[in-house]
Amino acid sequence: KVLEDQYKSMKAWVDYMTKNSKNDLWNTGFHFGDWLFYRPFDDNDGRSAVTDKYLIAQSFWAYSTQLLINAANVLGKGNDVSEYSSLLKRIKDAYLKEYVTPNGRLISGTQTAYVLALNFDMLPESLRPSIAQRLVDNIKDYGTQLTTGFLGTPYLCHVLTRFGYDDIAYKLLLRDKYPSWLYPVKMGATT
């Protein structure tokens, strides 16, 4: 019942993003980006933790479209499944052309960019292991700490464990030095 009630608004949201995209890229208008990411330094070597806001928008457009496809499947809306599956392919193809270099690197080499690309399956399966390794390398380069903000953080440990990096996920989870999830607890925070 809830899915039936919300289906129209889900479809309207995906249609809004589609209408406001250009050449299958949602890179127009205002986008927040990854809010409250940790920025320890920016040494001008491409290690800044700032993730391209349009890469983020494209990733979440794909995710929203996938959720709509899932809902359409459950509700037996075969025409919508077909239509939005075609759209999803175009969204991911445009992502590859715009945000992935010919040698398989993301143009935005941040933890959030890697996490979203992997969590939302934005990349061909052949590229995923190397991108997962780049994520781990980035985490280690920052002293085994996260630099993700609100948009990358919820998926970080899931992506690490999905690609076999349980040890890194546990190190991040159990870290109690700033920045970390346990630092506020160690400092006596109660919320």
Task: Specify the residue positions occupied by each region the protein language model found.
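Active-site core of glycosidic bond-cleaving carbohydrate-active enzymes
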Residues: 1-191
